[in-house]
Amino acid sequence: MGNLKLAIQKSGRLSEKSLELIGECDIQITQGKRKLVGFSNDFPLEALYLRDDDIPQYVADGVADIGIVGENEVLEKDKNVEIIKRLGFSRCRLSLAIPQDIDYSGVEWFNGKKIATSYPHILEKFLKVKNIDAQLEVISGSVEIAPGIGLADGIFDIVSSGSTLVSNRLKEVEVVCQSEAVIVATPNLSDEKQKILDDLMFRIDTVKNSKGNKYILLNAPNKSIDKIISILPGMKSPTVMPLHEEGWSSIHSVVHDKDFWQIVDQLKAYGAEGILVIPIEKMIQ
């Protein structure tokens, strides 16, 4: 059986998060001196380290079987690949921005204007839908400086926090699309590689299911069990086990981080003691 070939960005935040996810799936990938190809000794997986904008092409051509890449690159390259999993990290948006001192009246403002971008395909589709006639200035980097040096009237680029726009005296005026890290797959995988992919997706799901959840254990008087259970969500229902001390039980459940802080005072008011909150590495549903 051949290895499943996974394309990953060769450096940067997306690369770090991708390798972190694979590691949380208990798959360790060794890296060669040139960091072009990596192998796993405990799972039939081979990693190809590529430029992120090359990943859709490599996956579409079958050089890589799957890839972890920003959705923005998938939309821009528009290759024959299928998004099979959204990963929830490396979130950003693709937006139009203009100088802060301009009084923006709506998307029609871009008629007859010049827009600098590294994502011409996505922008062209958006402008066509909006019936906007603008000139595109395609550049490969430092898009945000284009208005300041007179290259363009506005820009279309990735926005995360928006701090880069502010530092270049720009303001975001139109959000065209959202993006996050996704897993894409080549069409027509062999049955053998599909089986490996299914196993990998199962591991990834168990890791993703655990995110933001905690295992909670507490001791409570039996008279308060029904009240406590009513505010503990659990996966099906909380586990209740009698303690050696008469009239007391131990209650176990799974709770989301944000929910715990909303109910902890109620738990204490109902007599809960010895509350333990434990991280969950993996959760199979």
Which ranges hold each PLM region?
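Small-molecule-sensing regulatory modules
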Residues: 2-44, 69-82, 87-93, 101-285
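Short, structured active-site "lid" loops
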Residues: 46-63
